[in-house]
Amino acid sequence: MNDILLKSVAILSKHSEKEDGMMPEGSAPMPHVDSVERVVTLVRNIIFSDYFNKRQPEEQIRAYYIGVNMEELYKLLNAQIARGLLFCSCMSEAEAADKARCLALDFIEQLPEVKRLLYTDVEAMFMGDPAATNYGEVIYSYPSIIAMTHYRIAHVLQLMKVPVIPRIITEQAHALTGIDIHPGAQIGEYFSIDHGTGVVIGETTIIGNHVALYQGVTLGAKSFKYDAEGNMLNVPRHPIIEDNVTVYSNASILGRITIGHDSVIGGNIWLTHDVPPHSRILQSKAVDASFSGGLGI
């Protein structure tokens, strides 16, 4: 048995040619997935402070708990951004450290807006779900709020051009909730996803305000464009969903099309063309084609 173990260790310790081709050059430290997950937890503790810290009515004590989380957040995010920069570029460690400090502070400066947006998402989810008994239930347990917390954090980092980390964050939410939102997607305020499992929102999707999706909705690409050398081009290829649109379960909206404001897209619809405002796109009514009493068979 020991010989088998030693043999496997020896083989696995050697880098394969394919493995070498996937590794970054040099020996730069790589982002730490558990630390990135902790970043999200700290942001959640700050934004939903009364729910995830000891609830304190006095502002001074509340500020203390937020401050403790904020200090840890800055240090951790600073370190992980630096690792991400080193992982994806030819920066020196000193250059990466300087840039990471600036980016971490920039992110923290944007936290009030992240908080504002997330509270609109909580309100939209609560108001749109008669099964929700209170706001706390939504914040603590709803998959859409878990996914949107991850997405709102990741989107800010994506706009700041932080490499790797935004995608790690949204894929952590994907694993937790079954909701797949690319950090590059643009999503307005008062956004809700009921149930959530199986929802996919692609990188270049644009979603307006007061939009509601149900489980299984895909906002995806219909086809891909290629350059002269056969490489896929990263161009807008996902839908634009305007304000006050509801998309019901398992609808697939594909390509760079626009769903006009105040529209309803029914369940199990396959849509690849523009829809004007105030539209209702529904399936044809089911037709009963059975034979009465078995006659005619």
Set out the residue ranges of the language-model regions:
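Terminal amphipathic alpha-helical/low-complexity segments used for targeting or macromolecular assembly
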Residues: 1-168, 295-297
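Structural signal for interior beta-strand "rungs" in well-ordered beta-sheet cores
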Residues: 173-289
